[in-house]
Amino acid sequence: YPNNPTGNLFAPAEVEAILRAAPGLVVVDESYHAFAGASFLSRVLEFPNLLVLRTVSKVGMAGLRLGYAIAAPAWIDELNKVRQPYNLNALTQAVVPLLLAEDELLAEQAARIRSERSRLHAALCNLPDVVAFPTQTNFVLARVPDAPRWFEHLRQQGILVKNLHGWHPSLEH
């Protein structure tokens, strides 16, 4: 449930307060669960209005377009009413059993990404005028002076980054 683009987690107590106060469905997107140190998946039985979404996209399998929802059966029944028929292509259907058999490999891959994320974050923090924000995802948000110039310089080095300059006033620079 870390968010994009900051990569940070909301305090569990804040999410719990929303779950207790909301009269309807609360969706927690855990697309980055493989990199986060927290999850609400184990709380689905505790909160009947909680639906957790997950995907394999963030662990290097975006092309499969495979995600899933975990919730009380009544919510899944409602989703099934609007779900398109044949919503998984044949390739994805063939790969799913292989993925399930390779959970250790996926966990190792996520661990490597977390390790490299830590190295990148530390290196960015050592650069002058760069602020790298804590993250629980597979990316690092950093504030740099003159972001368009940094973006172009990195692109010329063959390094592609997402330039968020101008997206929101709090993301300027």
Language model features with spans:
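Short beta-strands and strand-loop turn motifs
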Residues: Y1-N3, V28, F133-T135
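Active-site pre-lysine segment of PLP-dependent enzymes
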Residues: P5-V59
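A general structural detector for well-ordered alpha-helical segments in enzyme core domains, enriched
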Residues: E14-I18, L120, W150
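Short glycine/proline-enriched coil/turn segments at helix->beta-strand junctions
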Residues: R20-L25, E46-P48, A101, L127-D129, ...
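Short, well-ordered alpha-helical scaffold segment located
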Residues: S39, A74-W75, D146
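PLP-dependent aminotransferase class I/II
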Residues: N49-N126, V130-F133
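Conserved C-terminal alpha-helix-loop-beta "cap" of PLP-dependent enzymes
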Residues: C125-V131, F139-H173
